[in-house]
């Protein structure tokens, strides 16, 4: 009975559809035995196509960001360094999507061997954390720029040279469990060789719950606290400033951008992390309903998909809205760009230090 329980637990882990080890959906061993019937996978038909769409769009827009940074002459700003590293993390994350699209197409049958399973699973987790961590760094940097504009003008790129390696190291450490446990296992009742988190069978529930909660805390709760605090601080500070006429329009645009950053992060990642938390509750035995577990398994692939769209949105939030983006695009690609002009051309040159700093993050 114990062997069957372990097999059912491992098998149910596959049906969750989380191919890169961000979380594992199931209940405890007893509930897993009751829910171990083969699930319907018709809802997965659209996932590979959507993955390829996100891959193409995200890859193109992030390549533009990286190209602009590499072609930029003169010293780099701290904010530009963060944007560049964010784009690199998003590019590396998106580069793995064709493999996972194939994985979905073959209904969790991994065709690329155990080494690629471990490497690409770890690669995806690492760059997911790196992307989120750099978004957090940029929120803190923007807060300092707006609240303390004169001090922020003294920032030097060497300061970012210490923070950037630290962020990448933190992302690497956060992905170590995936690197250690990710492996290919044969799931006989599904007839596949699946790329899964191969936790020790006797401690499968504990490991799954622990990893799920770790993803919640490091990948969402702590970053969201920093991001929301920084942008609400920016909003509070700017609303106190006496802005009139065109400066008021500029201030309102900055406030809208700050709100968009917070909302984009929440919309893209909240569904995934809610399901991750429910997964942890299932592994701890708090959730024992087969119906609830089935709903989680059904929704999870689409929640992951929504999380990946954040890598497509980031360039628009952090780079393309920059005050000098059009000039950079003209100089690098030698093409006329007019779609972002609008009201910015008519802005008064007399702006507060806070607003001017916010407008030139990617100069």
Curated annotation (Swiss-Prot):
Listed result of changing residue 182 to A:
Abolished angiotensin II-binding
Entry's transmembrane regions: 46-70, 81-104, 115-140, 160-181, 207-232, 258-281, 295-320
Note whether Acyltransferase occurs among the keywords: no
One example of the protein's molecular function in GO is:
receptor antagonist activity
- Tell me the outcome of changing residue 104 to A: Abolished angiotensin II-binding
Tell me the residue numbers annotated for binding angiotensin II.
103-104, 182, 204, 215, 279, 297
Q: Where in the cell is it found?
A: Cell membrane
Indicate where this protein is primarily found: membrane
Q: Does the keyword Electron transport apply?
A: no
Name by which UniProt lists this protein: Type-2 angiotensin II receptor
């Amino acid at each position: 009975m114990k062997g069957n329980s372990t097999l059912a637990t491992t098998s149910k882990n596959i049906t969750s559809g989380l191919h890169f080890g961000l979380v594992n959906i199931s209940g405890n061993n007893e509930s897993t035995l009751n829910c171990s019937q083969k699930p319907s996978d018709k809802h997965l038909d659209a996932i590979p196509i959507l993955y390829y769409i996100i891959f193409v769009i995200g890859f193109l827009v992030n390549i533009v960001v990286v190209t602009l940074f590499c072609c930029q002459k003169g010293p780099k700003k701290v904010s530009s360094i963060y944007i560049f590293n964010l784009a690199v993390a998003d590019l590396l994350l998106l580069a793995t999507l064709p493999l996972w699209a194939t994985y979905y197409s073959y209904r969790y049958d991994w065709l690329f061997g155990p080494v690629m399973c471990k490497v690409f699973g770890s690669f995806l987790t690492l760059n997911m954390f790196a992307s989120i961590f750099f978004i957090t760094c940029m929120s803190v940097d923007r807060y300092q720029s707006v609240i303390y504009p004169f001090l922020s003008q003294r920032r030097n790129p060497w300061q970012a040279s210490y923070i950037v390696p630290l962020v990448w190291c933190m992302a690497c450490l956060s992905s170590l469990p995936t690197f250690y446990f990710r492996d290919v296992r044969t799931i006989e009742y599904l007839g596949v060789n699946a790329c899964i988190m191969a936790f020790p069978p006797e401690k499968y529930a504990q490991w799954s719950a622990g990893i799920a909660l770790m993803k919640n805390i490091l990948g969402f709760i702590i970053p969201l606290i920093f991001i929301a605090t920084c942008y609400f601080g920016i909003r509070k500070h700017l609303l106190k400033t006496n802005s009139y006429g065109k400066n008021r329009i500029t201030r309102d645009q900055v406030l809208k951008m700050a709100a968009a950053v917070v909302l984009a992060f929440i919309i893209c990642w909240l569904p995934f992390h809610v399901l991750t938390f429910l997964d942890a509750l299932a592994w701890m035995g708090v959730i024992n309903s087969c119906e609830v577990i089935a709903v989680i398994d059904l929704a999870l692939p689409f929640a992951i998909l929504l999380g990946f769209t954040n890598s497509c949105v980031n360039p628009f939030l952090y780079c393309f809205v920059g005050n000098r983006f059009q000039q950079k695009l003209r100089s690098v690609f030698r093409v006329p760009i007019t779609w972002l002009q609008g009201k910015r051309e008519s802005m008064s040159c007399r702006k507060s230090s806070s607003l001017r700093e916010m407008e030139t993050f990617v100069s």
